[in-house]
């Protein structure tokens, strides 16, 4: 496993990291023993960064992860959780200082730890950015001073939300950003933001290397917001890889983990075999010829992508549906 520095935090994270959203039991009842085995496989394979949120399964993911972490030496992993988004289905978003404090304490109890390495404002496209700057981030830094978290981050889908916060706060206020669906085979729009983020000293966490199912043989869910052009283009890429006996997920994960300025890419699963496959993928050399062929097939899509990415959503209701589908169906998974 390779490791990269996460911004200016001073820590080095595995290029492939574990998203525990699947532990929320959305598709089926959570099997705690399987969760424990999955996490053990991830850690034994060199993964050292774990991300979760109280929103995933409405605290079920944190609870299951806490059971899986029980007995594991704290120094073996870096742990991240979030505040602000609690239930997409119920529209429960609250970025107030009071809820933020209560949420982190509750998360620590569920996770069975005394502190998290990273606490993140979750899906800040749903928040009043004045509140994020003037209330939420100051509260997170207060919790940091109390020793409950080491670093502070922000997460979201539209890329423009990151400068809208970072340009309003002092350097060092935000240590990391988490972006999803913007560095993958069919959408590399995150690349344009990387020089800015490096200048700000902010570490980059990437997620959803398969575009929420676009780059998989199983295809996408009904709610997926991608256009017919993007869906068809990705389908051709999937079929091209299959014709060569390759699961495109392998190439997608390898590509997502290949950028030297992106510290880590999250994948999620509750199956030991699947996380083992992903670890094996990043340890094997990428087929550069196949990559060139797939990127050529996807070029008509890439030139259509706006600065906000292929999954850019204009309306708030559209964003809510996308994020609701994403987080409740745990499609960080490959």
Language model region names:
Residues 1-77:
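N-terminal binding-site loop/beta-alpha segment at the start of enzyme catalytic domains
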Residues 29-42, 95-111, 158-167:
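Short, acidic/polar
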Residues 124-301:
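Beta/alpha (TIM)-barrel catalytic core signal, keyed to glycine-rich beta->alpha loops juxtaposed to Asp/Glu
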Residues 312, 317, 324-334:
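Low-acidity, Ser/Thr- and Arg-rich intrinsically disordered low-complexity segments
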């Amino acid at each position: 496993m390779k490791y990269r520095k996460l911004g200016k935090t001073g820590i080095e994270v595995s290029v492939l990291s574990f998203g525990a959203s699947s532990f929320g039991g959305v598709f089926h009842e959570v099997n705690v023993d399987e969760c424990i085995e999955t996490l053990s496989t991830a850690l034994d394979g060199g993964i050292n960064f774990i991300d979760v949120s109280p929103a995933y399964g409405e605290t079920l993911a944190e609870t299951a992860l806490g059971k899986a972490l029980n007995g594991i030496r704290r120094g073996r992993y870096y742990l991240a959780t979030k505040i602000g988004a609690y239930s997409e289905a119920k529209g429960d978003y609250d970025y107030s200082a009071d809820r933020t404090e209560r949420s982190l304490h509750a998360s620590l109890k569920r996770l069975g730890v005394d502190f998290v390495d990273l606490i993140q404002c979750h899906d800040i496209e749903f928040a009043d950015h004045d509140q994020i700057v003037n209330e939420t981030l100051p509260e997170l830094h207060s919790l940091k001073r109390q020793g409950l978290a080491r670093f502070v981050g922000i997460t979201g889908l539209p890329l423009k939300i990151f400068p809208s916060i970072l340009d309003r706060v002092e350097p060092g206020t935000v240590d990391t950003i988490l972006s999803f669906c913007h560095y993958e085979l069919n959408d590399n729009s995150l690349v344009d933001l990387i020089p800015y983020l490096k200048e700000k000293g902010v570490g980059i966490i990437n997620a959803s290397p398969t575009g929420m199912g676009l780059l998989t043989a199983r295809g996408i869910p009904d709610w997926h917001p991608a256009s017919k052009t993007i869906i068809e283009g990705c389908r051709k890429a999937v079929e091209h890889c299959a014709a060569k006996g390759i699961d495109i997920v392998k190439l997608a994960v390898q590509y997502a983990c290949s950028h030297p300025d992106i510290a880590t890419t999250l994948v999620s699963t509750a199956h030991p075999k699947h996380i083992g496959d992903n670890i094996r993928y990043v340890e094997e050399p990428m087929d550069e010829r196949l990559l060139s062929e797939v990127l050529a097939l996807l070029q008509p899509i890439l030139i259509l992508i706006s600065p906000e990415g292929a999954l850019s959503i204009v309306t708030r209701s559209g964003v809510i549906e996308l994020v609701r589908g994403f987080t409740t169906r745990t499609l960080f998974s490959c």
